[in-house]
Amino acid sequence: MLNEQKCEACSFDAIALTKEEQQSLLLQLSDWHLIERDDIPQLEKVYKFKNFKQAWAFSNKIAELAEEEFHHPSILLEWGKVTVTWWSHSIKGLHKNDFICASKCDALVLSE
C-alpha cells in the first residue's frame, strides 16, 4: 500500500511519472484528482470538516507529515475545508512521492 511506503530523495534529475503511471497510482487513491497548473501536473484533493478548528488541526497534521517525509505540499486552509496539492517542485511534475504522501493524508483522516 502506498501509505506504508517512504518518500525517496527526489533531485532535479529525477524522472517524472508518465501519464500512464499517474493513472495507475491514482487508482490506489480515493477522491484525488490530477490537475494542471502553470503547465505542471499536480495531485489535488479537498477535505471537508465541520468547522475551522478541525480543518486547522488537519492542516497541522499534514505539515508534520510533510516534515517527516521531507516533501511539502500546497495547503489551502479555509472554514470547513482543506485543499491539499502535491507535486514535485524539483522536477516540475509528479513523482511517486506525491502519491505516497497523498495516501498518507488519507490515512491521517482515517486515524481521527
Swiss-Prot record:
Q: Which UniProt keywords apply?
A: Lyase
Q: Please, one GO biological process term?
A: tetrahydrobiopterin biosynthetic process
Task: Report the family membership.
Answer: Belongs to the pterin-4-alpha-carbinolamine dehydratase family.
List, alphabetically, the Gene3D superfamilies matched: Transcriptional coactivator/pterin dehydratase
Q: What is its EC number?
A: 4.2.1.96
Its protein name is Putative pterin-4-alpha-carbinolamine dehydratase
Q: Which organism is it from?
A: Vibrio parahaemolyticus serotype O3:K6 (strain RIMD 2210633)
Looking up InterPro entries in the UniProt record yields: PCD_sf, Pterin-4-alpha-carb_dehyd, Pterin_deHydtase
